[in-house]
Design a protein with these regions (language model features):
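ATP-dependent carboxylate-amine ligase catalytic core
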Residues: 1-59, 75-77, 105-106
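Acidic, Mg2+-coordinating active-site environments of NTP-dependent enzymes
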Residues: 12-14, 37-45, 61-62, 66-153, ...
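A generic structural signal for residues located within well-ordered alpha-helices
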Residues: 23-26, 87, 165
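Gly/Ser/Thr-rich beta-alpha loop segments that engage phosphate groups in nucleotides
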Residues: 49-52, 80, 92, 162
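Hydrophobic alpha-helical scaffolding
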Residues: 101, 160-163
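A short glycine-threonine-serine/GTX helix/turn-capping micro-motif
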Residues: 153-161
Length: 171
């Protein structure tokens, strides 16, 4: 597998193009693996996320998910939350549902505009979807309340409020 990817990298450099980054090489290897294994469904996580991410060549995903956007990767994505949100909104595809975690208002505005522009249905968990969050040595548990007010008790072997928020996106 890696020999094929290495050969493709060499072909690029022989044409005077820059060698792909480590992440781009790993992403190419993953895509090749998925193809060779005839995967029906792939849950693919972006690197930094966004328009320029190596994973963003999937043109018709089943769904896109955007977790919490904050002031990270600023040298690549922008210097304000709005700029970073705009870059990360690049994974939203036309007529493809997108799920977003709770965001700062400025971020939500950017995501809503991009989703509307691309006719992509935007879903966000209710602000109060996570209730009674408790931590222990085994992780955490919380009650999740859906849009229709169905309630589930969720246990995760992870800790951190952001993990609960990510779980809410998945649910």
């Amino acid at each position: 597998l890696m020999e094929k990817v290495e050969k493709a990298c060499l072909a690029l450099t022989e044409k005077g193009l820059p060698h792909p980054t480590s992440f781009e090489v790993e992403t190419a290897a993953a895509f090749l693996y998925f193809k060779e294994e005839n995967c029906d469904v792939v849950l693919l996580e972006t690197g930094m996320g966004g328009r320029e991410d190596a994973t963003n060549l999937i043109t018709h995903p089943l769904c896109s998910v955007i977790t919490s956007i904050s002031m990270d990767h600023m040298q690549f994505l922008g210097n304000t939350l709005s700029e970073i949100a705009s870059a990360k909104a690049g994974i939203i595809k036309e007529n493809c549902p997108v799920v977003s975690s709770w965001q700062e208002d400025v971020v939500t505005e950017v995501l809503v505009k991009e989703a509307e522009r691309l006719r992509a249905q935007l879903y966000q968990p209710k602000k109060d979807a996570i209730r009674d969050l408790l931590y222990d040595m085994n992780g955490m548990q919380f009650d999740y309340v859906s849009e229709d007010n169905s309630q589930w008790k969720i246990k995760l072997p992870l800790t951190g409020a952001y993990q609960a928020a990510n779980a809410a996106c998945a649910l």
